[in-house]
Amino acid sequence: MADFLGMMKQAAQLQSKMQAMQEELGSLEVEGISGGGLVAVRMTAKMEVKGIKIDPSLLKPDEAEILEDLLVTAHGDARRKAEAAMQEKMQAITGKLGLPPGFGFG
């Protein structure tokens, strides 16, 4: 019975930590860059795009295809960084539970 109560307490603590992590991920921003800095995409670790910067040299009609490619690349870079930040936060929480490697959430 004591083990069950301990597990319930641990589950409640985990839920509280997960909620705090979700809030933190919403405010944690990463930046993806492409074209040597010609294009940058800022997003939260919850994958919400917050801003896009485009070098004025790319704002020409004949540069549209290049700009499109750079935007896709910068977005992908930002997404990978956001996913890495989320995994890092998850490991910080689930690592304290003593779960085997790869058994965390997400």
Swiss-Prot record:
Does the keyword DNA-binding belong to this entry? yes
> What Gene Ontology cellular-component terms does the record carry?
bacterial nucleoid; cytosol
- Where can this protein be found? Cytoplasm, Nucleoid
Task: Tell me any Pfam family this protein matches.
Answer: YbaB_DNA_bd
Keyword annotations from UniProtKB, A to Z: Cytoplasm, DNA-binding
Instruction: Give the GO molecular function terms.
Output: DNA binding
Entry function: Binds to DNA and alters its conformation. May be involved in regulation of gene expression, nucleoid organization and DNA protection.
In which family does this protein belong, per the annotation?
A: Belongs to the YbaB/EbfC family.
**Quaternary arrangement and interactors, per the entry?**
Homodimer.
Provide the protein name.
Nucleoid-associated protein BBta_7345
Q: What is the lineage of its organism?
A: Bacteria, Pseudomonadati, Pseudomonadota, Alphaproteobacteria, Hyphomicrobiales
